[in-house]
């Protein structure tokens, strides 16, 4: 294995690990402060650290392009979509569980592939269709103990899943817009703009009075969530420069399993784990396996 591939695998694994434990930290914060304020700090910490880092390293090479009308419009649409994605995700997480949130978010890359088929006439192989069937079967198995919550009563948990599904679909549209921006900018050049858009978007929606109620441990969780946002996306971008996107997707598909494990050993006491029946565990594995097959199979 070449050094580039080794680096790529390390970056991708880092991203999967950070995204796997992120919802656990968020739940620890959400018991005290609201979703908007939590998300504001995620964007603020990432923006404040990344901006001077890029300036000092001279990596903002296309600053003049930022002010072109077409580019401003593209950044605005993509940035708002990302903000909506973050908001929907954290509201859905607040109504469900860490494991459910990460399983539902696996819908996003699968939907992105399907968007390529229907919007851009890309090919979808028989193996990929098989992966999609396994993926959907996994979703049904994972949420089978919650059947009444989701399909009959549509209570807090069921509505949370619908919100998470909306978050996943919003991410698909964001990814399509970001893909057009990556023709003119590096991933870091786009993310620093998105972070500041997030700061401006969530600032007026935030309520800072509740911050005085945060414990020292919760403040550490807030800082961790901001650093997680920055490092995870940075690692994700670096992984894509070293190994194929399909390999990165395959590694990131393991995120729900990481969450499933760490929920059981987390020091965050307010967590309510999903019932770990054999069907639920197999469902999680099917979701991961189906996602890997769908993203990695040759077109």
What are these regions (language model features)?
Residues 1-40, 88, 150-180, 221-222, ...:
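Glycine-/small-residue-enriched transmembrane alpha-helix faces in small-molecule transporters
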Residues 12, 24-27, 50, 112-114, ...:
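Transmembrane alpha-helical segments that form core, pore/gating elements
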Residues 14-16, 41, 100-107, 177-198, ...:
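Helix-helix packing/entry segments at the starts of transmembrane helices
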Residues 21-23, 58-105, 141, 223-243:
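Specific transmembrane alpha-helical segments of multi-pass solute transporters/efflux pumps
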Residues 29, 38, 42, 92, ...:
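Hydrophobic/aromatic residues within transmembrane alpha-helices
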Residues 32-84, 111, 115, 169-177, ...:
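Transmembrane alpha-helices of multi-pass small-molecule transport proteins
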Residues 43, 144-145, 218, 253-299:
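C-terminal-most transmembrane helix of multi-pass membrane proteins
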Residues 49, 109-133, 257-282:
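C-terminal transmembrane-helix exit sites in multi-pass transporters
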């Amino acid at each position: 294995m070449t050094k580039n591939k080794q680096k790529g695998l390390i970056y991708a694994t880092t991203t999967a690990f950070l995204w796997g434990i992120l919802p656990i930290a968020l739940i620890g914060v959400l018991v005290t402060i609201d979703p908007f304020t939590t998300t504001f700090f995620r964007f603020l910490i990432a923006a404040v650290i990344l901006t001077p880092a890029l300036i000092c390293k001279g990596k903002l090479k296309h600053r003049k392009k930022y002010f072109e009308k077409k580019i401003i419009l593209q950044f605005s649409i993509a940035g708002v979509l990302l903000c909506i994605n973050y908001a929907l995700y954290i509201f859905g997480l607040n109504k469900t569980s860490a494991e459910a949130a990460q399983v539902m978010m696996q819908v996003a890359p699968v939907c992105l592939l399907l968007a390529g088929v229907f919007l851009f006439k890309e090919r979808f192989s028989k193996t990929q269709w098989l992966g999609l069937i396994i993926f959907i079967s996994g979703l049904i198995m994972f949420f089978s103990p919650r059947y009444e919550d989701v399909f009959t009563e549509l209570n807090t948990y069921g509505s949370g899943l619908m919100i998470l599904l909306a978050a996943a679909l919003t991410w698909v549209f964001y990814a399509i817009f970001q893909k057009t921006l990556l023709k003119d900018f590096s991933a870091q050049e786009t993310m620093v703009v998105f972070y500041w858009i997030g700061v401006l978007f969530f600032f007026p929606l935030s309520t800072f009075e509740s911050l005085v109620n945060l414990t020292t441990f919760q403040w550490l969780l807030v800082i961790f969530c901001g650093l997680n946002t920055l490092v995870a996306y940075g690692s994700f971008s670096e992984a894509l420069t070293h190994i194929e996107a399909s390999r990165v997707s395959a590694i990131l598909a393991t995120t729900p399993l990481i969450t499933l494990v760490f929920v059981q050993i987390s020091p965050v006491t307010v967590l309510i784990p999903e019932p770990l029946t054999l069907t639920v565990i197999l469902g999680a594995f099917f979701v991961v396996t189906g996602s890997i097959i769908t993203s990695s199979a040759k077109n």
